[in-house]
Amino acid sequence: MTLYAKWEINVYTVSFATNGGSKVSEVDAEFASLIEEPTPPEKEGHSFKGWYQDELLTEAWDFEVETITENITLYAKWEINVYTVSFESNGGSQVSEVEAEYGSSITEPVPPEKEGHSFLGWYQDELLTEAWDFETSTVSEDMILYAKWEINEYTVSFELNGGSHVSEVEAEYGSTITEPAPPEKEGHSFLGWYQDELHTEAWDFETDVISENMTLYAQWSINNYDVHYDGNDYDSGEAPLTEAFAYDSEVTVAGQHTLGRNGYTFIGWNTERDGSGDQFEPGDTYRMGSEPLTLYAQWASNNAKLSELVISHGTLTPIFEADYAHYAVEVGHQVTSITITPTLQDTRSTVSISQNEAASGEVSSAIPLEEGLNTIIIDITAEDGSTYAYTVDVMRKVTDQFAQLTRESHFVTLDDEQIHMLDEEGTLRVDLQGELDDVTEVKFTQYQVQLLQEKGAFVQVVKEDLLVYIPFINFEPVKDLNITIQRQDYNIDTFAFADRSASAIYQLNIDQNGERISVFEHDIQLSFPVKNIGETNLEELQVYYFNPDGQEWELIGGTYNNGYIHATTSHFSTFAVFHPDHLSVEDDVTQDENGEEKSEEDNKEEIVEENTEEDNKEEKTIEAGEELPLTATRTYQFLLAGIIMLVGGSCIYVFYRRRNIMKT
């Protein structure tokens, strides 16, 4: 038999390896049969390219002809998709589209540009909510990336060109800005804002828009201001004309022009009427300010006069008048200082006294006075600097003054000045010593006699061998006066016992208007320097006058003191000094100087003198140097000496008492 083999056709499984694609179910297929191509699998970002018999995808499976012969696996072949990425720049510059495989990233293109905007990146959606990250995001389909933009903000700065500050502003591109408040600049007017430094293109805040950071430049015009001149209380002429000057330009201050003001001097201009501002002199320069300026004329008083001048001692001569500059004042010797009270007519002036500052209406500090002439200068300086000076010659009188003598032949005359300087009861000394020793006459004018008489002054004529002290109260003030002082020779033929004189012999006379004055109401003092004659006791010397009628010497008296014999007399004659013992006792002395009859005591003196003469004859035989015996004659001599001393003391007492009365 034939056994017949029974065959069962094999059924094979065909599996599908989708290689990442969607699942494809396996199918069973008989041997040598065809299989139906399954629905293509899907794989994101890929395109299906068919089934392949090998993993290397080199041998495609053709479902039309290929049959199944075994269990097999078909492998899906895929081709990665390439997508187009387009760029929507939203008004920016164009960006070319790019091709990119699925799952790949793309290189970020050069950022687009858009005027007035800043590029913020690419976004996957039109609403710009999801940014595209070129580092991590991958392409999965054809797509459009959308540019995102931010509008720019720009800073607008303002260049003030010296004006007040204006803050910069921020503004979006394409927007207008609000015009700021106009700046200020001293002395200038604001003309507007310009886009360029040269101020050629103005900025219009209504229409011009911001497109970048920018600076607007202020333009200014310089202002002009008036300078006005005010005469400020002037009373004549005209002020300079008003002028206009640009701010900060140099201004030259005008002069006085024809302005005038009585009693004042123009001293310049000031920015304040009362002179409290800035002061300018004509010709000064200054920079013009930022407002009109008025300059006020400034006037300084030229009054440098006093309204009153008061002195603490004496009287001004003449009476004070403001326009008279020179005055004289006499004060006594006891006044050692004075004060002056000057009162200014204008209190804006200043006053100084002998270069020491003083105050108007106030007593000055004490001004010391020297003996004689003291010149005090009172300087007034007016407000305008002009000056005026008052001179006050203060004569501080002296108690003892030497006369200024002028010799003419045998006589001298005197200058008035020294007499003016003499104080009340002062002594004017007429010095006739030395070269003037031979002068025999001193002449006084009527005016000088009057001055000396009014002052109750004394004149002392000084010779080398005689002092004569004469009170001028004795004389009439309306007559001139001559004093004759003539030294006599020691001629015994003219004057008995002249050779025995212990002093010079002088003839003294006083004449007024040619009339000899014989007797004086107030005694005149004589002082003789005496010489020592042998062993004569100087204290016993006496002054005598010569009586020409009897040709004899008559006693005046006297007191010895320090080399001088002093005596007083009420008349002038010829005078000399003798020791009583050196005159003849035979009536040589017969009466006192007043011609009074001798008293009983005087007669006793005569007796003593006669006895003394007899005794002297006897004593001549006694050798010199031998002590005389104490006889009755000597007793009388001592008695006589005592009487003489008593009389001399009485004379001194009378002399000083009379002198004190005269001074009182």
From Swiss-Prot:
Q: Does the keyword Transmembrane helix apply?
A: yes
Question: Which Pfam families does UniProt cross-reference here?
Answer: Cadherin-like (PF12733), Flg_new (PF09479)
Q: Where in the cell is it found?
A: Cell membrane
Gene Ontology cellular component terms for the protein in this record: plasma membrane
The residue ranges crossing the membrane are 636-656
Instruction: Indicate yes or no for the key word Heme.
Output: no
How does the protein associate with the membrane? Single-pass membrane protein
- Compositional bias per record (Acidic residues), positions renumbered to this chain: 588-616
Name recorded for this polypeptide: Putative membrane protein Bcell_0381
